[in-house]
Design a protein with these regions (language model features):
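Alpha-helical transmembrane segments of multi-pass membrane proteins predominantly involved
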Residues: 1-351
């Protein structure tokens, strides 16, 4: 498939989405937060359907639009409930008026968490991710896997640990459930995938589960471990998609796992890069991905949340299977026709 995305709208949409995320992250008010969220989402709807001549891209954009609109409605309803219970939309004023025994406001928190869980594709609000990742241009998929997730996780931290830190007993188990479900489902669902972008979609769901595990603890160590994890995950994703964008032959991109067959024989440097990246994503020491998971598990075990740690370890073992399967295809399967080597300098530098 030939991806014709070099149009003037493309950078404008990317910048509009980033602007919305910056507004969302820096907001101290529910209304401003919602406006930033919608500015981000409107740009992402168009980016998802940028290859409008292809059925998969149009389907992905429509599915993302419908489900995102539903989640935004639930999130706005949660904001209205919180305003109704507290009389304010300012985070600081909300925090000053709350007590730890105000259970009624939990309904508002739940609705907002549902909306945010959709944005980071946490289970069970992940339905859009595989189709959108596969149907979007590869560079847009890279954007989806990195920037919106960082913004949404930052909002998770600001939202839960500023106005609602006193209500940790009400929202902690919600995050624990989202974390466990995401880690297990993402790891298991990725096993049967043949498309690299769908595999990364399910893999990202699993990785978000680890980041949520850090946030669910309710301590500074948990927040720090979550931030470290998502930072390392972003770097690994950038490297993986750089390799994916280099899989081009005669102006056509290839994105199936079988297209990596025997890659080491024709492209040894790219194969070595993928080896390091996939080992790191699998959490194999002494690479960065291992330390990312180590800090998460350390913070979880220190708070005696042993079941969460056991589920995380089990998910890591399951996920290692499909990462190692890709490495086996790269190094031990028969080689295919060589890919182009005239890549942009920026792509080579990012790798």
């Amino acid at each position: 498939r030939i991806f014709k995305i070099f149009k003037i709208e493309y950078p404008i949409l990317i910048l509009s989405s980033v602007l919305g995320m910056m507004v969302m992250i820096s907001s101290n008010d529910l209304i401003v937060f919602y406006m930033g969220l919608e500015l981000q989402s409107l740009a992402l709807y168009v980016l998802a359907t940028f290859n409008r001549d292809q059925l998969k891209s149009s389907e992905a954009g429509l599915k993302y639009f419908v489900l995102s609109a539903l989640s935004s409605g639930l999130l706005l309803y949660g904001c209205s409930l919180i305003y109704g219970f507290t009389g304010s939309t300012n985070f600081d004023l909300i925090a000053n008026q709350l007590n730890s025994d105000e259970y009624a406001i939990t309904f508002g928190i739940v609705f907002i968490l549902v909306g945010l869980a959709f944005k980071i594709s946490a289970v069970p609000f992940h339905m859009w991710a595989p189709d959108v990742y596969e149907g979007s241009p590869t560079s847009v998929t890279l954007f989806f896997t990195m920037v919106p997730k960082v913004a949404a996780l930052t909002v998770f931290i600001r939202f839960l640990y500023v106005p609602f830190v006193n209500l940790i007993d009400q929202w902690q188990m919600i995050l624990v459930f989202l974390s466990i479900a995401s880690m297990l489902f993402g790891a298991i669902a990725a096993i049967g995938q043949t498309n690299l972008k769908r595999l990364i979609a399910y893999s990202s769901i699993s990785h978000i589960g680890y980041a949520l595990a850090g946030l669910a603890i309710g301590t500074n160590d948990g927040i720090q471990s979550s931030v470290i994890y998502i930072t390392i995950y972003i770097i690994m994703n950038l490297g993986f998609f750089s390799c994916l964008l280099m899989m081009k032959r005669n102006n056509e991109y290839y994105e199936d796992i079988d297209d990596l067959s025997g890659l080491s024989k024709n492209h040894p440097l790219m194969s070595l890069s993928l080896l390091v990246i996939l080992f790191s994503l699998a959490g194999i020491p002494p690479l960065a991905g291992f330390f990312a998971k180590f800090y998460i598990f350390k913070a979880v075990i220190e708070q005696s949340m042993y079941f969460l740690a056991i589920v995380g370890l089990l998910s890591t073992v399951i996920a290692a299977f499909y990462y190692l399967r890709i490495i086996k295809i790269i190094y031990f399967d028969p080689e295919k026709e060589k890919y182009d080597t005239d890549h942009p300098v920026g792509l080579k530098l990012s790798l």
